[in-house]
């Protein structure tokens, strides 16, 4: 199995086909196998050199225990590390869900490497303060409060009726 390394984290990837390089990045709790299972690889590999990547924490890639190891800039760096190992200067990108979020990171941290970038159902990182210590005023803090509030409301006796 091929791996690239970014800051001591091994990132698993696979390459299929020939043609223009196209990175496919899966969503949260999936792996690169998702692209095979959903039938994307066979029709696309005739026109593209598909670079399928297991995001850090997923599939056969390393799973660091430190929450800071999952910062958007590091995740974008993982994609760049794979491309560098393959000696690919520019690639198109498609990511969905968490993969779409990683795509926003590529647009921010490595725009010169991606002439075309497409995301589906990815959350924009605009206004997001990352990390476990995001303040209540940040988007992350407000979302956390909303989720915790929903959870508490769902556990109330009235909500269970």
What are the functions of these language-model segments?
Residues 38-43, 67-70, 110-111, 134-136:
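Glycine-rich, phosphate-binding/catalytic loops in enzymes
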Residues 1-3:
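Short, hydrophobic/aromatic-rich segments at coil-to-beta transitions
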Residues 42, 52-94:
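Active-site loop/oxyanion-hole signature of alpha/beta-hydrolase fold enzymes
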Residues 6, 17-20, 46, 84-90, ...:
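Active-site acidic short loop of glycosyltransferases
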